[in-house]
Amino acid sequence: MATINQLVRQPRKRSVEKSDVPALQNCPQRRGVCTRVYTTTPRKPNSALRKVCRVRLTNGFEVSSYIGGEGHNLQEHSVVLIRGGRVKDLPGVRYHTVRGSLDTSGVKGRNQGRSKYGTKRPK
């Protein structure tokens, strides 16, 4: 146990919390350009073809970003907005593309949870 004198001379170190999304640099979202759009398979025990894109951000970072929802219109050189949020069964994918903003279209025919997929309200 440290004495009060020792603590006055050298206070206790605060532990620095490590960010889960370092490429965002404390911003809520970041803009970037798709360098590669591809599908990948998840870890065991799941099985699927998950849609992922590699994005070069405006701050110079290059990250993998998950494309949620059914169907998408992204290709190389598409400008996308990414947010934080990892995909548990895809190693190395720590970001999500924001649907319905910039070059990313919303999900067609979506009626529930529309705000998460950038779908306008049906008339």
Curated annotation (Swiss-Prot):
| Gene Ontology biological process terms in this record | translation
User: Which GO MF terms does the UniProt record name?
Assistant: rRNA binding; structural constituent of ribosome; tRNA binding
- Tell me which UniProt keywords the record has, alphabetically: Methylation, Ribonucleoprotein, Ribosomal protein, RNA-binding, rRNA-binding, tRNA-binding
> 3-methylthioaspartic acid: which positions carry it?
89
* Source taxon at top rank: Bacteria
Instruction: Spell out the residue ranges making up region: Disordered.
Output: 1-22, 100-123
Instruction: Quote the cellular component terms of the Gene Ontology held in the record.
Output: small ribosomal subunit
Compositionally biased intervals (Basic residues): 111-123
Q: Describe its partners and assembly state.
A: Part of the 30S ribosomal subunit. Contacts proteins S8 and S17. May interact with IF1 in the 30S initiation complex.
In the record, the note on similarity to other proteins reads:
Belongs to the universal ribosomal protein uS12 family.
| Protein role | With S4 and S5 plays an important role in translational accuracy. Interacts with and stabilizes bases of the 16S rRNA that are involved in tRNA selection in the A site and with the mRNA backbone. Located at the interface of the 30S and 50S subunits, it traverses the body of the 30S subunit contacting proteins on the other side and probably holding the rRNA structure together. The combined cluster of proteins S8, S12 and S17 appears to hold together the shoulder and platform of the 30S subunit.
Which NCBIfam families does UniProt cross-reference here?
rpsL_bact
Protein name, per record: Small ribosomal subunit protein uS12
Species, as recorded: Pseudomonas putida (strain GB-1)
Q: Which gene encodes it?
A: rpsL
